[in-house]
Design a protein with these regions (language model features):
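N-terminal intrinsically disordered, cationic/polar leader segments
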Residues: 1-30, 40, 44-115
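Short, conserved glycine- and acidic-residue-centered signature motifs
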Residues: 31-35
C-alpha cells in the first residue's frame, strides 16, 4: 500500500509518500504510476516556485523512501490552492483504490488562514 501523509496549515505544506501500491506487477501498476506522476509534478512545481522566490523555503528529498516534500507557503493563497489541489488529487486516487492508497491529512487551513 502507498501511504501519503499530508501536514498542512496556513503557512506550510508537507507531503510524505512511501510504499508500493501492489495493484499490478512492476511496470504495469497504474495506481503506482498515477501517484508517482502527481508526486513528480508536485516536486517540480515546488522547485519552480522556490527558484522564483514565490515560496520562502522549500525542501525535496527525492532519493528517500518515503519521498518527502516540504514547502513554506508564506500564507500565499495561490500557493495554498496549488497545495490543496494536490491533496484533492491524492484523495481521489485513494478513493478509487482504497486497498492500494491511503491518505492521512494532519491539520488543515481554514478560510481565514489564507489571508
Amino acid at each position: 500500500m502507498i501511504g501519503i501523509t499530508v501536514r498542512q496549515n496556513e503557512r506550510c505544506a508537507e507531503f510524505i509518500v512511501g510504499g508500493h501500491a501492489e495493484y499490478a506487477e512492476k511496470g504495469k501498476d497504474i495506481v503506482c504510476a498515477g501517484v508517482s506522476t502527481l508526486v513528480n509534478a508536485l516536486a517540480n512545481i515546488i522547485r519552480e516556485l522556490g527558484e522564483k522566490d514565490i515560496i520562502p523555503l522549500w525542501m525535496i528529498w527525492p532519493d528517500e523512501d518515503p519521498f518527502h516534500i516540504y514547502a513554506e507557503t508564506g500564507g500565499n493563497p495561490a500557493v495554498n490552492t496549488v497545495m490543496d489541489t494536490f491533496v484533492t488529487e491524492f484523495c481521489q486516487i485513494a478513493g478509487q483504490y482504497p486497498d492500494n492508497v491511503q491518505v492521512q491529512i494532519i491539520g488543515e487551513r481554514s478560510e481565514d488562514d489564507s489571508r
